[in-house]
């Protein structure tokens, strides 16, 4: 894999399912074992907020694999451009 990505296991509003989902998805955590199966120069992405120790291991989130902070930074500018486009006078 060139890119490894994940999201939170429990969405906002579904907190009552959190403990059950942790049990079900534990084997899908992005950690060094999983990243070792990806390409040497693979990157890790996450839409944030991340739950450290659940869907993502601390080591990966803070590693050279992680492009999470750049992804978040880019999302800011993508959102700004979309808002400008939607609010602009379209002919």
Task: Show the residue positions of the predicted features.
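Rossmann-like adenosine-cofactor binding region
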Residues: 1-59
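C-terminal helix-to-coil terminal segments
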Residues: 62-91
């Amino acid at each position: 894999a060139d890119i490894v990505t994940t999201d939170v296991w429990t969405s906002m509003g579904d907190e009552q399912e959190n403990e059950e989902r942790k049990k079900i998805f534990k084997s899908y955590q992005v950690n060094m074992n999983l990243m070792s199966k990806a390409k040497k120069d693979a990157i890790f992405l996450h839409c944030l907020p991340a739950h450290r120790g659940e869907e993502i291991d601390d080591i990966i989130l803070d590693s050279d694999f992680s492009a999470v902070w750049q992804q978040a930074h880019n999302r800011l500018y993508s959102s700004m451009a979309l808002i400008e486009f939607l609010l602009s006078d379209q002919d």
